[in-house]
Amino acid sequence: MRNKAVALISGGLDSVLAARVVMEQGYEVTGLYFTSPFSKSYGSEELTPAVTVSRSIGTDLRVMDLGQPYIDLIRSPKHGYGKNINPCIDCKIHMLERAKVVMDEIGAPFVVTGEVLGQRPMSQRRDTLHIIERDAGLKGLILRPLSAALLPPTRAEQDGLIARDKLLGISGRSRTVQLQLAERFGIQGFSTPAGGCLLTDKNFAEKLRDLFHDQETITPHDIQLLTVGRHFRFDNGVKIVLGRNNRENHILMALAARGYHLFMPHGFPGPVALFSGTPDPEVMQAIGRLIITYSKQAPGQVRRIRFGSEIFDPGDPLPIQSMGLKKIGTKH
């Protein structure tokens, strides 16, 4: 029976290379790909790079949703945030805790990651790598094949389960060695570095901070809504989301079935608005004016708004601030 190992597979080059290097030593690798509402591909039916690269090296892949506990972690991470609202250290610890469960389940002696010493300023420093494996309950059990020659031997190396002289000593941000290895192993379809996490995006981070401030309980649906449209908030805390194009309008209309109120332009092209709260007359008028402000209809023409079975004239558009509204996010 072949020895088994568990590997975190992100879809990027480093993680699949790490798995492939371990496979060179005769291990059967089970890949783990974690999804969350903070992944740009979350909910997509298309093949992710993680699926593509796993197939290219011939390893099985388990897709695991990080779920509600991960959302709660993002709100208050023990080790803080990176440049935006990305808690990279806590994120890696959480994934490794989940990986440890699978490791124990299949009887694997270690977990493989594609971490490279010094590649990322927050989560891949020498001291941080130690903190991550300690807090994940995996001290001595995380094998980092790409940088192993520069790190203390793991338990697997000490016990002779892995040949240390066949592991690599890569460090820093250069990817020359990795690209050479990818060509050697015939690996294609990998994603760009750090390209799939919404938490590193400044615009998304501002919207998420606003949501954390406003709501105690946050669901994956709330997170997905942050990726769509222009976001505004009334002085009283109520939020509105406006579609920016036809695709986003259809997404917002689908979300309306989940307890949101939907306002639509009646008889003219323009954005739809999603709203949660009590639609009193003043709020309805402001939402209608906001829709008109962002519509392409020529000024002076009569424009009405549909809310359920009601059709009303909100009046002429006004400046955003004078309607008691604040823009949320950096892209409008």
Residue ranges and their predicted role:
Residues 1-184, 328-332:
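ATP-dependent adenylation/nucleotidyltransferase module used to activate substrates
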Residues 141-332:
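AMP-forming adenylation/ATP pyrophosphatase catalytic core
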